[in-house]
Amino acid sequence: MTQKAIYPGTFDPFTNGHLDVLERALNIFQEVVVVIADNSQKQTLFSVEERLSMIREIIEDYPAVSVEVLHDGLLADYARQKGARAIVRGVRQVKDFEYEFQISLLNRHLYPEVTTVFLMPNVKYTYVASSIIKEVAMLGGDVSKFVHPSVLKSLHGKLDESKQHKPNNI
């Protein structure tokens, strides 16, 4: 059994699909570090601090899981620094795999000792993506089956906040 893996992502927000992949990773690895990518090229609904706080609350009952932020740099370098020999990636569809496969080859080139492990979520989460969750929530849909209660509360808070800042169109 490989000791440590990292599970990187934007996690904006962290969904039950992410949690499902994390739990599957814990069946393989003794320790998993959830790594929040602070990617300045991606526009996120939640700040890094908000995502960190939400994930910490979700993983508090998982002693083998920690969460950290990768502000800058390459994921392969980060994995090497942390002594991780595996990168966990959730793959929902073929389209995800094609992209992730290319990234995994690059990571292996940069850090030959690292292996990317692709995990499929439970079938009920195969269509769940953070972007879809945000869109459905913004349109008033119920996303409670797809996110942790604390994420749902934060999501509603963010949406209420954005409604208050929008000018009324008459």
UniProtKB/Swiss-Prot annotation:
Localization per record: Cytoplasm
Family assignment from sequence similarity: Belongs to the bacterial CoaD family.
Gene coding for it: coaD
Keywords: ATP-binding, Coenzyme A biosynthesis, Cytoplasm, Magnesium, Nucleotide-binding, Nucleotidyltransferase, Transferase
GO terms, molecular function: ATP binding; pantetheine-phosphate adenylyltransferase activity
Residues the entry annotates as binding ATP: T10, F11, H18, G90, V91, R92, E100, Y125, T126, Y127, V128, A129, S130, S131
Biological process annotations from GO: coenzyme A biosynthetic process
This protein's name: Phosphopantetheine adenylyltransferase
Keyword Cytoplasm: yes
Chain sites annotated for binding substrate: T10, K42, L75, R89
Assembly and interaction partners: Homohexamer.
Chief location of this protein within or outside the cell: cytoplasm
Site label Transition state stabilizer, positions: H18
